[in-house]
Amino acid sequence: MNEADVTKFVNNARKTLTDAQLLCSSANLRIVDIKKKLSSWQLSISKLNFLIVGLRQQGKFLYTILKEGIGTKLIQKQWNQAVLVVLVDEMKYWQYEITSKVQRLDGIVNELSISEKDDTDPSKLGDYISRDNVNLLNDKLKEVPVIERQIENIKLQYENMVRKVNKELIDTKLTDVTQKFQSKFGIDNLMETNVAEQFSRELTDLEKDLAEIMNSLTQHFDKTLLLQDKKIDNDEREELFKVVQGDDKELFNIFKTLHEVIDDVNKTILNLGQFLQAKIKEKTELHSEVSEIINDFNRNLEYLLIFKDISNLIDSFKNSCTQDIQTTKELCEFYDNFEESYGNLVLEAKRRKDVANRMKTILKDCEKQLQNLDAQDQEERQNFIAENGTYLPETIWPGKIDDFSSLYTLNYNVKNP
C-alpha cells in the first residue's frame, strides 16, 4: 500500500465531490425554479378556472335578477300594474269624486242668503269652499304620459340588456371561454395534464439520480478519509484500500454519468419551459377574454344602477300621488261634512224662525191681555174719581189721584233670524 496513492485518492475524491456539488447545486436550483414556475402556472390555472366558474354563476344570477327582479317584479307588477293601472285608476276615481262633489256644491243655492229685496243671483254652496287642491290629481294625471314614456324607454333598454346578457354574454362569451378553458386546461385535455405531470415526474427522477450520485461520491470521499486516518487495523485498511482503489477508477465514469444526468435536467427544464411558455401564452389570451367579460359585467352593473335611479324616480312619483290621493280623500270627506252641516244649518235657521214666531205670538197675546187689563183699570179709576174725587184734596196724593196714565209700558222687539 502506497501512502502517495492514498493521498491521490483523497485529492481525487475531494475534487470530484466538490465539482459534483457545484454542478448538482446549480442543477437543483434550476429544478426548484422550474418547479416553482410549474406550480405557479398550475395555481394560476386553478384560479382562472375558479374565476370562470364564478363568472358563470354571476351570469345566471344577473339573468335571474333581470328576468324576475326587474322584468317581472319591477316593470310588470310595480310599474305597469301598480303605477300605470291601479294608481292611475285610483287617481281618476278620486278626481271624479271630488269634481262631482264640487259640481254638486256649485248647484246648491244657499237658502240663507236669499233676500226679497235682492234681485241678484243667489250664492251657491260652492262659493264658500276652497278650491286650491281640487285639481291635485288632474295635475298628477298630466304627468302620467311622461312616466309612461320613461317606462317604455327603460323597457326597451331592459329587453336589449336581457338579450345581450343571455345571447352575447352567457350563451356566447361565457360558453366560449368555458369551452376554451376545458379544451386547453380542463379535464377534457388529459394529454396536456399528462405532459405537465410527466415533466414533473422526470424532474423528480433526475433529482433522485443526482442525489444518488452525490451520495455515492460522498461515501467514496468518506472512505478515502478513513483510509488516510489509519485508525483501522492493517487487514481492514488493506481491504479498504482495494475498495477505494476500485472506486477511484470509476470516478471518471461517475462524473460522466453526472454530466449526462445534468444534460437530461437541462433538456427537461428547456422542454418544460417551452411548454409553460406556450401554456402561459394561451392562459394570457384566455385571461384577456375573461377580463373583457368582467368589463361586460361592470357595464351591466352601471345599467342596473340606471334601473335603480329610474325606480327611485317612479317610487317618488308614486308616493307623491298617494299623498295627493289622501289629500283628495280628506277634501271629499270635508265637502260631504260641509254639505251635511249646511243641511243642519238650514234646519237650525228654521228652528230659530219658528221660535221667533212663537215669541211674537206670545207677545201679541200678552199685549192684548195688558190692553184689556188697562181698559178695565181706566174704567175703575173713573168710577173711583166719580165716587170719591169730590171729597179728596189734591195734596193728599199729589199727581196721582186724577192720573189716568197707563200703569204699564211695553216695548219689545223680536229679531228676524
UniProtKB/Swiss-Prot annotation:
Subcellular location: Cytoplasm; Preautophagosomal structure membrane
GO CC annotation, single: phagophore assembly site membrane
Membrane topology: Peripheral membrane protein
One biological process term in Gene Ontology: autophagy of mitochondrion
GO molecular function, one term: molecular adaptor activity
Entry similarity comment: Belongs to the ATG17 family.
Role according to the record: Autophagy-specific protein that functions with ATG13, ATG29, and CIS1/ATG31 in response to autophagy-inducing signals as a scaffold to recruit other ATG proteins to organize pre-autophagosomal structure (PAS) formation. Modulates the timing and magnitude of the autophagy response, such as the size of the sequestering vesicles, through interacting with and regulating ATG1 kinase activity. Plays particularly a role in pexophagy and nucleophagy. With ATG13, is required for ATG1 activation by autophosphorylation of 'Thr-226'. Recruits ATG9 to the pre-autophagosomal structure.
Full protein name: Autophagy-related protein 17
Keywords recorded for this protein, A-Z: Autophagy, Coiled coil, Cytoplasm, Membrane
Main localization of the protein described in the UniProt heading: cytoplasm
Residues in coiled coil: 146-221, 353-384
Subunit field text: Forms a complex with ATG13, ATG29 and CIS1/ATG31. The ATG17-ATG29-ATG31 complex interacts with the ATG1-ATG13 complex. Forms a complex with SNX4 and ATG20. Interacts with ATG11 and the conserved oligomeric Golgi (COG) complex subunits COG1, COG3 and COG4.
A Pfam family the protein falls into: ATG17_like
